[in-house]
Curated annotation (Swiss-Prot):
Species lineage: Eukaryota, Fungi, Dikarya, Ascomycota, Pezizomycotina
Induction of synthesis: Up-regulated when grown with elevated levels of potassium chloride.
Entry keyword set: Cytoplasm, Hydrolase, Magnesium, Metal-binding, Stress response
The enzyme's E.C. designation: 3.6.1.1
Assigned GO CC terms: cytoplasm; extracellular region
Chain positions recorded as Mg(2+) 2 binding sites: 121
Native source species: Emericella nidulans (strain FGSC A4 / ATCC 38163 / CBS 112.46 / NRRL 194 / M139)
Location relative to the cell: Cytoplasm
Name of this chain's protein: Inorganic pyrophosphatase
Length: 287
């Protein structure tokens, strides 16, 4: 199953969108791409939103028709994540699992916080840098529970199944064995990344510990069930667009509606302010 991207507008502009296509037809990365890539449910599909080492805060747009990837904004301005020394941009290929949802109406019994109303976040730790809209096949290794502004914001740790290291990584302790320091750096990155923007340090559940593969799979299962309730009308959709081209439900759209999406264009990125590359030195950050 091969997916391609359809890019609209210049990167680093308010108009830029990345749609995902299957066989040339736009699909929703939130609703149409299956969570599992094999019958055994051991390989999962992940949508890359933010490639490693980049700063533009891009995400699946929950509210827009077919949920394209766009750059997040704050007060009308494009959002870029700051560089907190010694890090540069994101440490991993960052993205989301399709057909998952962190229900904002449900308080998790262990984190004591409600879901963040987004698809489940994923950190892919393989060696290749991805691209926005890439659909990677990954295997699950573990999960961290960030508490972001009083919401549970799970971060699932995965690796691309085609990565040379993938056969050696089967659970969270293997990550520390083969990639020493990465989990500690991941904890620090999420803890401090909002400080340059005047926000307080983020907190973690479980004292910042990364839970194992079994725990992560339970979280994924819960979020997949929550998505099922969302698309079947059992949960309040709020502002979320449930438009899709494959589910065969009341929100499914036909090809005439899909034709309303503009044709793709491969435009160069717009210039961005050089201060995006500034390093911020955070007191108490480990080096």
């Amino acid at each position: 199953m091969s997916y391609t991207v359809r890019k609209i507008g210049q990167p680093y502009t308010l108009e830029h969108r990345v749609y995902i296509e299957k066989d040339g037809q736009p699909v929703s990365p939130f609703h149409d791409i299956p969570l599992y890539a094999n019958a055994e449910k051991t390989v999962l599909n992940m949508i890359v939103e933010i490639p490693r080492w980049t700063n533009a805060k891009q995400e699946i747009s929950k509210e827009e028709f077919l949920n394209p990837i766009k750059q997040d904004t704050k007060k009308g301005k494009l959002r870029f994540v700051r560089n907190c020394f010694p890090h540069k941009g994101y440490l991993w290929n960052y993205g989301a699992f399709p057909q998952t949802w962190e229900d904002p109406n449900v308080v998790h019994p262990e984190t004591k916080a409600k879901g963040d109303n987004d698809p489940l976040d994923v950190c892919e730790i393989g060696e290749l840098v991805g691209y926005p809209g890439q659909v990677k096949q990954v295997k699950v290794l573990g999960v961290m529970a960030l508490l972001d502004e009083e919401e549970t914001d799970w971060k699932v740790i995965v690796i691309d199944v085609n990565d040379p290291l993938a056969p050696k990584l089967n659970d969270i302790e293997d990550v520390e064995r083969h990639l020493p320091g990465l989990l500690r750096a991941t904890n620090e990155w999420f803890r401090i990344y909002k400080i340059p923007d005047g926000k307080p340090e983020n907190q973690f559940a479980f004292s910042g510990e990364a839970k194992n593969k079994k725990y992560a799979e339970e979280v994924i299962h819960e979020c997949a069930d929550a998505w099922e309730k969302l698309v079947s009308g059992k949960s309040d959709r709020g502002d979320i667009s449930l438009a899709n081209s494959t589910l065969g439900n009341s929100d499914s759209v036909d090809s005439s509606k899909l034709a309303s999406i503009p044709r793709g264009e491969n435009l160069p990125p717009a210039p961005i302010d050089g201060t995006i590359d500034k390093w911020f030195f955070i007191s108490g950050a480990a080096v």
